[in-house]
Amino acid sequence: MAKLNLETLEKWLWDSANILRGHIDSSDFKNYIFGLMFLKRASDQFFEEAKIAVEKEGVDLEEAIEDEDYHRFFIPKNAWWSEIAKKTENIGQAIDQAFSSIEEYNSSLEGVMTAVHFGDSEKLPDSLLSRLLQHFNKYSLANSDLENPDILGNSYEYLIRQFADDSGKKGGEFYTPKEVVQLLVQLIKPEAGNSIYDPTCGSGGMLIESAHYIAKNGGMLGEYVDCTLKGQEKNLGTWAVCKINMIVHNFKDSDIRKGDTLGSPKHIINGELETFDRVIANPPFSLSNWWEAAEVDIKTDVKGKPVTPDYKSLVSDEYGRFKYGIPPRSYGDLAFLQHMLSVLKQNGKMGIVLPHGVLFRGSSEGKIREALLQNDFIEAIIGLPEKLFYNTGIPASIIIINKSKPQELKNKVIIIDASKEYKEGKNQNTLNPESIEKTVKAYEGMQDIEKFMRIVPLEEIKENDYNLNIARYIDTSSEEEIINIENVINKIADIEEKEKEIDTKLNEYLKILGFVS
């Protein structure tokens, strides 16, 4: 039998989503499809591992199946795909029980499988689930049946992108367009041996792309990439998707925690924030009510109207992350940035995607921006094109922070206007490879490029009240067209001559018709 290739795998997996269409919201497809995909993969690979143990260790098949030492994930009998696939009644409950059993035997999967529930028979009747099981039964996902084991991770990335496209604005909650991720990773340049952290990791794309970048640049240790991947995600379903994403990409030592990064960061060592070599993120744009502790007990005035919480007095962070200022309640952008800055090592580099407003808004945000510039943390600002993201059409920017800037960039900021570097689409624009390469080369070259890049001294930024609006530093106006007056006069004369000819012919026709004498 021919081995499963990437094209067939992608189409097969995406067709499974079409079975669900009309029964559940498209934004929830990923939770169910990835759960079943992982169950099928884990079960198929479980039996392949048993066969390998029989061949290499000389044990009998029953022992190879039952001994946990022979398996990456131990799959109990009630979770074997063969057992699930033959169910005709109460299929959803059987799947939920299988997921619970897998978690009992595999502590690293705690909460991952049970993040989604199949037991709602009104939403997922047996007839529908039976079709899904039959569909997934078509191919084996064991390594020996794949053209290359890597295609499983590639197909997972493909599905995430398809689900994001299908979900519209909701897609932006768990997925950043791959081209934006590639640009960001190439700007911060993770290296072999680095620890990499994403505080709002979504489905894990930025972490995985960082690891791929390291691998492409010789950072392999045997079959594994020489790096440490860590992240945190607030949404339970998206966290589970990210955990499975790490598994299918073979990043077995990744550490993805669930929870609110701002209110309760999870990567703590001896009571202190863990620090990292590279920090990368695309946090939710302009998140309001970002400090949940201040939103729990909203006071009311004498008329019974809610009193807006005073974040300046209510935000109290035990880790001292907001020492440059408390961002306003309506805009959490610089709260995420300061969190990332706090977990960045002294020789580390970070990149964050934020809306343009953080570059010029005043009040507390202006004071935070001034402090970041005065401390010489900001290395570069890159303005991106509009309509790149699923959940907003507004243009965004990339901010690169480097705690150990090279001497030639001390008290200077690279500002790049890449807003015109895109391929236009019907609903969404994309960065093309040439645009990414142009931006990265400009950043690395550290030379002014007319209408595209400037290295701006801090003194000039100070004169502009620490406003980083890109248009203040790079002339983005189009060149005025030089008009040849003589050509214009000649064209007007030609038009007037043709007008006379038309009038003459019109009069001739009117005479024939008897309207004029």
Task: Identify the residue ranges that each predicted region occupies.
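Soluble or luminal CAZymes and related metallo-dependent hydrolases
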Residues: T8, W12, K234, G332
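A generic secondary-structure signal for well-formed alpha-helical elements
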Residues: K40-A53, F163, I214, N250, ...
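Non-catalytic, mostly N-terminal accessory regions of nucleic-acid modification and defense proteins
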Residues: M1-A192, R257-K266, G383-E386, K410-S419, ...
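A conserved structural/catalytic subdomain of Rossmann-like adenosyl-cofactor enzymes
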Residues: A2-L4, G263, N270-S517
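Conserved, well-folded catalytic cores of nucleic-acid-processing
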Residues: I19, Y139, Y158, Q162, ...
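Conserved S-adenosyl-L-methionine
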Residues: K170-A281, F285-K305, L334-A335, L354-G357, ...
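Glycine- and acidic
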Residues: N18, L141, D165-K169, I196, ...
